[in-house]
């Protein structure tokens, strides 16, 4: 298990953290992802929870949040999540999901191919717009993916 904090370049990029969450969910122990670049970046966590991940929102104790966070701290909402704790290892299970956005879609897909059972994704154009031919590329690496056109 490991902890990461997102940062602006050259730090750990915020775009990596959803995919990283899927990977570290397989690790033994507890890991924390602390998001300091974007507000409300953990929408994907609910999908991973539905697939079996043990994820809980946490609020890190930060002495000077205006200096740590790269967004306007005064704009935050009570429902905003700034970090999650992932307790592993996780054995992801399948499900049916409508992909809400690019990063959540790639995260669900990664969890699905690393887990057990059948997963059905709709609204996959969200994934396609950022990952060209991802199904073919992952299939060439041994993933079992079948694209069905409606």
Task: Enumerate the language-model features and the residues they cover.
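Short, structured segments at the rim of ligand-binding sites
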Residues: 1-150
């Amino acid at each position: 298990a490991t902890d990461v904090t997102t940062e602006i370049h050259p730090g750990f990029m915020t775009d990596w953290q959803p995919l990283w969450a899927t990977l570290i969910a397989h690790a033994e122990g507890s890991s924390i992802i602390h998001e300091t670049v974007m507000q409300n970046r953990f929408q994907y966590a609910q999908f991973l929870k539905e697939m079996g991940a043990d994820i809980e929102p946490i609020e890190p104790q930060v002495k000077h949040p205006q200096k740590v966070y790269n967004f306007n701290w005064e704009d935050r909402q009570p429902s905003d999540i700034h970090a999650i704790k992932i307790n592993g290892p996780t054995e992801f299970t399948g499900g049916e999901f409508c992909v809400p956005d690019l990063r959540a879609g790639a995260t669900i897909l990664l969890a699905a191919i690393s887990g057990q059972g059948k997963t059905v994704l709709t609204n996959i154009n969200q994934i396609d717009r950022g990952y060209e031919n991802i199904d073919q590329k992952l299939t060439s690496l041994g993933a079992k993916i079948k694209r069905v056109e409606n």
